[in-house]
């Protein structure tokens, strides 16, 4: 789960082309502009993670650790929230990311590729397989260890920013239809991550805070039903809901999703509040929120690391889940759906490219690290999880790139000319 920042509106209500038409139509220029932004964001994300790794393995490591533990407190009257900087990033900044996810999910379901059942079938099947495969691999590696089983969801997520960054390196060898398919698959992946967080990684609940959070949610959707289009009203209520959800015991990032879903897609006077906010948030998330998250979560000391450390069942479950479970789940589910006639491959793609894409979904990175902090809040497995996620993500990215680097068949004339 990855880390998703998906495409802007590249189709209209009047015409919702499938992957083939999308790959060849004029509105694709908007998608291509976004993909350039997202690919650049993936590069920044990679740079932030690299800097964190360097700092964590240098004489500056104590300063890096002190920065993450820096206490930050906000108090308004009798309400006080005090957390180390690391948790402000994970609970606060990531709520902004999930609000963007909510905006994008709403748009895609109501107007985008997922509004059409035939277009949605293949990415839905691929995403479901891509979540089930890694989970089963992790469960197989850790069966019988009740504590370790809490981490079953860690390898189910895909970091879309990194995956798109790899596709960008391929140039014309990665057809636009393949990128659109990856984006659509990532939407379902993020929906799955949201549901997993809500159902399986919720701490003990505070009834009073939960009631207030519910009131905030009701007020958000009441604004929508009343025709309110000023996004400031939604954001203010969103902050209130975030505080209540944080205090309730449910993970606070879910407040971001709910806020995004509540903002109107269209207004009566022709404006598009959700679309406008989505466009405004894109650069902040791609070049701010996600790189900051990577910087604060990817730093892991490698001193004393031995091969035996990677053979612990938790690391094996995460690593094999991302490396093996992801590709088998995505590829297997897509192959079955194509064989039984449920869906067809995106136009201009072949099975080798689909397999390369399946490998790229094994880039868990930011979302896998994020779910890891929820599954194991204590520091007992912190370093082990980070090492497994980082190593598996790098191998998945490398293998996916090599497979897609030489698409042997099924290239379109445009691709052959471009090469």
Regions found by a protein language model. Give the residues of each.
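Transmembrane alpha-helices that form the ion-translocation and gating core
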Residues: 123-164, 317-375, 391, 398-406
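Structural signature of hydrophobic alpha-helical transmembrane segments
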Residues: 86-98, 146-161, 184, 202-218, ...
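Functional cores that coordinate and move charged inorganic groups
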Residues: 167-264
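Entry/N-cap segments of selected transmembrane alpha helices
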Residues: 108-135, 206-215, 302-328, 351-355, ...
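Hydrophobic alpha-helical transmembrane segments in multi-pass integral membrane proteins
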Residues: 136-137, 196-197, 246-250, 290-304, ...
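Hydrophobic core segments of alpha-helical transmembrane domains in multi-pass membrane transport
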Residues: 44-57, 97-103, 133-138, 216-222, ...
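Predominantly late transmembrane helices and immediately cytosolic-facing juxtamembrane segments
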Residues: 4-6, 13-37, 53-57, 70, ...
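Transmembrane alpha-helix boundary signature
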Residues: 55-67, 83-86, 100-117, 132-153
């Amino acid at each position: 789960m990855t880390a998703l920042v998906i495409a802007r509106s590249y189709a209209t209500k009047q015409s919702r082309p499938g992957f083939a038409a999308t790959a060849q139509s004029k509105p694709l220029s908007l998608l291509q502009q976004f993909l350039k932004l997202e690919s650049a964001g993936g590069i920044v994300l990679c740079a932030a993670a690299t800097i964190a790794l360097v700092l964590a393995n240098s004489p500056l490591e104590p300063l890096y650790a002190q920065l993450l533990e820096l206490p930050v407190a906000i108090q308004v009257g009798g309400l006080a929230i005090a957390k180390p900087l690391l948790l402000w990033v994970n609970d606060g900044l990531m709520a902004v990311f999930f609000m963007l996810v909510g905006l994008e999910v709403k748009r895609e379901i109501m107007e985008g590729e997922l509004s059409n059942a035939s277009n949605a079938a293949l990415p839905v099947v691929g995403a479901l397989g891509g979540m089930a495969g890694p989970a089963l691999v992790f469960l197989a590696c850790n069966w019988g260890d009740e504590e370790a089983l809490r981490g079953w969801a860690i390898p189910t997520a895909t970091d879309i920013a990194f995956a798109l960054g790899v596709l960008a390196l391929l140039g014309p060898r990665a057809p636009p239809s393949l990128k659109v398919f990856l984006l659509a698959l990532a939407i379902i992946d993020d929906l799955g991550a949201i549901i997993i967080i809500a159902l399986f990684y919720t701490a003990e609940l505070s009834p009073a805070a939960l009631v207030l959070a519910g009131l905030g949610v009701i007020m958000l959707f009441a604004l929508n039903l009343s025709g309110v289009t000023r996004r400031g009203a939604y954001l203010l209520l969103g902050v209130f809901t975030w505080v209540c959800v944080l205090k309730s015991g449910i993970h606070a990032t879910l407040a971001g999703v709910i806020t995004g879903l509540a903002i109107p897609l269209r207004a009566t006077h022709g404006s598009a509040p959700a679309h406008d906010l989505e466009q405004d948030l894109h650069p902040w998330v791609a070049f701010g929120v996600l790189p900051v998250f990577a910087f604060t979560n990817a730093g892991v000391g490698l001193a004393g690391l031995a091969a035996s450390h990677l053979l612990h069942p938790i690391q094996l479950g995460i690593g094999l889940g991302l490396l093996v479970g992801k590709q088998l789940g995505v590829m297997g589910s897509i192959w079955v759906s194509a064989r039984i006639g449920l869906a067809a491959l995106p136009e201009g793609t072949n099975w080798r490219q689909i397999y390369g894409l399946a490998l790229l979904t094994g880039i868990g990175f930011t979302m896998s690290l994020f779910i890891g902090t929820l599954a194991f809040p204590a520091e007992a497995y912190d370093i082990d999880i980070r090492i497994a996620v980082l190593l598996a993500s790098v191998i998945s990215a490398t293998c996916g790139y090599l497979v897609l680097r030489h698409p042997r068949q099924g290239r379109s004339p445009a691709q052959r000319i471009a090469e």
